[in-house]
Each structure stands twice: as C-alpha cells, then as structure tokens.
Amino acid sequence: MLPYLTDYENDRRLFRPRMVNAILALLPFMVLYRATELWFSDMYWFDYMKQGHYGLMWAGLCLLSVRKPRFALVAAYGDAAAIVIASFTGDALREYNKLTATPEDYIKSCEGKLAHHAPWIWIQLFFTVIVLYVAYARQIEPRIKARRERRGK
C-alpha cells in the first residue's frame, strides 16, 4: 500500500488551496451574474453573457485553476473587467452612432454602424490581458526572481 494515497493530512493540505483558487476564480463571475440580475439586465452584453456564457467560462476557469492557479485568476479577473468595459463602451459607441446614423444605416443595422460592438471589444480586451500575463510570466517574472537572488547573495 502506498502511504501517500491514504495520507489524510496530505490530501487535505493539497485540497484546500485548490478549492480556494477555484472559489477565487469564480468570485468575479458570481458578482457579475448577480449584478446582471439586479442592475444590468437591460444592457445587451450583460444579458447575452448571462444567458449561458458565464457558465462556460466558470467551468473552464475552475478546471484551469487546479493546474495553473495564477493564470486562472488573471484570466477570471481580466475577463470580468473586459466584460464591464466592453459593455459600457459598446453601449456608448452604439448611442453615439445612432446620433449620426442615416436611413441606410437602419436598413443594414446588423453589420453597420448600429451593430453592438461589445463582443469585439470584449474579445480584444480579454486576449490583451492573456497576452500581457503570458509575456509577464515568461519574460519579466524570471528577471525579477534572478535579481532577487543576486541581491540576496
């Protein structure tokens, strides 16, 4: 019998940080979901995300938080910020475009000036956060660690 498979303390010590990371990754989505139900239900992008896309991100980031907790936390909070920024920016852009719209713009509203640009803004912001984190993790963080080691010696 392998001792590490039956060691209760070892299991508990490994399980607790993983649960904390999963809860921390879910926290911004729970807050956004509740805020959407209470205040933002009339806004297009919040309502669209509430209809099922929050759930997909929750599941993915919970699974990711087991192996890559820092990446999952950065992705979760970056995604929440991107959703909020994209929604308000998309609504403001659409209202501005309504003021300058011509009758032809109303005919082709799904692809023209009157389309809601929140999904594209969200995708760009989300991938910007991911790329910046990957660049930080691969380039900047090792340099910081090396500098700390040199100063400590």
Walk through the language-model features, giving the residues of each.
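Short, charged juxtamembrane terminal tails flanking transmembrane helices
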Residues: 1-8, 145-153
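Alpha-helical membrane-associated segments of multi-pass integral membrane proteins
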Residues: 25-28, 101-149
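Juxtamembrane/transmembrane-helix boundary motifs in multi-pass membrane proteins
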Residues: 9-13, 17, 42, 46, ...
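Aromatic-anchored segments of alpha-helical transmembrane domains
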Residues: 26-36, 78-92
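Interfacial non-cytosolic loop connecting adjacent transmembrane helices
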Residues: 38-50, 86-121
